[in-house]
Amino acid sequence: MHAIVEQLKSTVAATAATDIRGAFASDPKRFERFSSRFDDLLMDYSKCAVNDEIMALLETLCTQAGVAEKREAMFNGEAINFTEGRAVLHTALRNRANTPVVVDGKNVMPDVNAVLHAMSAFAEGLRQGTITGSTGLQITDVVNIGIGGSDLGPAMATLALAPFHDGPRLHFVSNVDGAHIADTLKLLEPETTLFIVASKTFTTIETMTNAATARAFIASALGEDAVGDHFAAVSTALEKVAAFGIGSDRVFGFWDWVGGRYSIWSAIGLPLMIAVGADNFVEFLAGAHAMDMHFRTAPFRENLPMLLGAIGYHHRNVLDYPTRAILPYDQRLSRFPAYLQQLDMESNGKGVTIDGSPVKGNSGPVVWGEPGTNGQHAFYQLIHQGTSVIPAEFMIAAKGFEPELRHQHDLLIANCLAQSAALMKGRTLDEAKGQLLKSGMDQAKADHIAPHRVFTGNRPSITFVYEQLTPFALGRLIALYEHRVFVEGVLFGINSFDQWGVELGKELATGLLPVVQGKAGTDGQDASTAGLVAALSDLGR
């Protein structure tokens, strides 16, 4: 693989591939040749530093890395997360074909379908008012208490599908900072509130701390006996859940082969189902399943996850671009960049390959972003004129959900396409001078000001266009990015499905808590940590 990476670098230089503006000038059919479509989902990668030679090399790279073979190993339930000895089967959760998926000799689909059925019955009971609070009043507000994958996915998707909400209001509490749950509880009435505690082990410190506060909120207002009517759990720790006061009929489980950042398709998606209904949740699963089948069957130049992953690797390891910006032109996708940040950086933020040796070159990029057009008035300046090249990934729907505001959606589309074009085209010094002179500026001043109005252009971007952000379309989009992360992980040569980097800070925080509380001294702490503890204590701890 190293030889192909070096060949890619030399090909980029020899073919002037980074002159994207020039490539469009010389090839009027570039868009047709470097875009691909899956149903209504269009991926335009023509504004990236690629050509036919580079795409052929990237395809060879994927072949040599064994992407297709490792993809099938994942779908077939092999323990590709070898550091934890686990299969990776979030795809089974959305297997709408219901074909057998075998793990350790057992078809998991009956269990998957049983949990989905139980979720549906509970969600519809809440939505229809047959499942009520302890006083008999209908539940109007549902609070999901979780963190990481137990929060980011359902929070993102629930906001994204706001036009489909016809159930209780949804709230999400994740941060152990007491302000988060305190601000949420101020909005709620105990009699009409249900809390979902999402923690596989029922030991996650942030989640269980917030859950205890929520429990006290219910118990103090309605009594201890009311707790069970105002809580549900997504967990496998049945004894701990029972000790908390939640009945087994309100516990929804999932499996070790579902990683947290891939768990929106599982019972972790219960808040989304409550908001949009079981039928729309199944449509969400169906969209992801459609992308799964596309990923498994489409040839490389038509395979959106393969293309996105290969180009992402090209940006990171051939062109050495350190970050990527996720720029959805949809306010309801405002949490999508944060969701992808966890999905990508927790998966591919690794420094060791599968064989235990250091990664050669780079692993995953920094992933960040905000919705357009907000970002245009914040950080796009750096993307356009900064010294680092930042690949951008735009997404825009052809239709919104507010027909009476069609003119605003037209403006949104125009801005999205304009930003993509501006990053590619830029503005030369001569063009900048000409514009200033045309405005009436004298030559000397124009010569002085023009360099500040130069845009180098040739800034790469990918644009996704789709009809409308329906449950099906959202499921398809999330699955596309999941598989992109998988492809890049294979090319990096790493295990994308563990997250040992999350654990060290947890371990240290557990040891530091008694120090912060003044129950233990700072002996054994480094000087900086000891000094910070002392400073906080002096400020009134």
From Swiss-Prot:
Ranges in a coiled coil: none
UniProt keyword annotation of Isomerase present: yes
Major subcellular site: cytoplasm
UniProt-listed Enzyme Commission number(s): 5.3.1.9
Keyword Cytoplasm: yes
Cellular compartments annotated: Cytoplasm
Protein name as annotated: Glucose-6-phosphate isomerase
Source species: Allorhizobium ampelinum (strain ATCC BAA-846 / DSM 112012 / S4) (Agrobacterium vitis (strain S4))
